[in-house]
């Protein structure tokens, strides 16, 4: 059992809790926290020194919707590659903020490669491995001094798997002196939070403004993550980065991330997220970006692309056509969004329905901006289309998919077209 955490009373209506008030952190052209929309970020899995491969993957992630991209900076070659990666991306018209992920030797790499220090939009620092023993404070200070020199924000990110062992041991010793000792899990959660908070306050003492700091304290368990972030959010006003350390592969990773992050987001906690999925063989790295966007959209935080409601199918829907049409519609609107974002702003808020029989089909279709109710088993071979709650037309024949796509495009142009003046 986890210790009870005081939380606000849920709202009476179907909305989320108000967003937590935090510092606003400027990262390149993106602002995190301060009431701004929750930001989607991702991380490459290329060798950063492979400039061509890294540029391609960053570009792919950006096109998929990642608003910040983190890259490993673990040696001199990767540090030297960063400014070249930034230059090549800008030549492609891509100005996405790049975050340098540092462990163990970040203080050395940034000092040796000032062009890297300048090119990065943010530094990620792990207080659990920034230095050990007497070197810890010195090396942490060198990283913060670099951030101050180049006016860069930092994320101080504590991780369950690389926790500051000296701090953990100290808290274990203190716990042993309690009249009623905490369980080991609570002590470790406190160590994780303290590692992040104490490091942040030390950075402020060294001269880094509070509005240049983001915090994270990641674990891999859903309930542990929720408990850690609720506690940390109640103890500071820093912007928070949400994510499981390792969510896992396939549906497990998606479900775990959604289970943890949706609870926190609905409570107003979290200013930027990453879904740390393990890609399945042959799967694009961009999948984690799509999942992050869908999580934010389904929880009502942001809108990225029109949402398609589709029934799961049952014995009344022996035809697979409605399933195929739902996929075609989803792919069409996702492919059109980069264009619509410019020419038809607001189209991302559109709702669509592709239903498979008369039971819920007409009702769900009326709730959507545009919906189609396809015939189920034994029903007449016709498909009524509803637009803004009213029956508009009945589609029949072999070209239902093309005609329905055409109606969607017409609706977008009619409803969301950017008007001159």
From Swiss-Prot:
Cross-referenced Gene3D superfamilies: Dihydropteroate synthase-like, Sulfite Reductase Hemoprotein, domain 1
Pfam annotation, one family: GcpE
Annotated GO MF terms: 4 iron, 4 sulfur cluster binding; 4-hydroxy-3-methylbut-2-en-1-yl diphosphate synthase activity (ferredoxin); 4-hydroxy-3-methylbut-2-enyl-diphosphate synthase activity (flavodoxin); iron ion binding
Cofactors named for this entry: [4Fe-4S] cluster
InterPro entries xrefs: Dihydropteroate_synth-like_sf, IspG_bac, IspG_bac-typ, NO2/SO3_Rdtase_4Fe4S_sf
EC main group: oxidoreductase
Cofactor note: Binds 1 [4Fe-4S] cluster.
EC number: 1.17.7.3
Name of protein: 4-hydroxy-3-methylbut-2-en-1-yl diphosphate synthase (flavodoxin)
Cited function: Converts 2C-methyl-D-erythritol 2,4-cyclodiphosphate (ME-2,4cPP) into 1-hydroxy-2-methyl-2-(E)-butenyl 4-diphosphate.
Binding residues annotated for [4Fe-4S] cluster, in chain numbering: 311, 314, 357, 364
Family: Belongs to the IspG family.
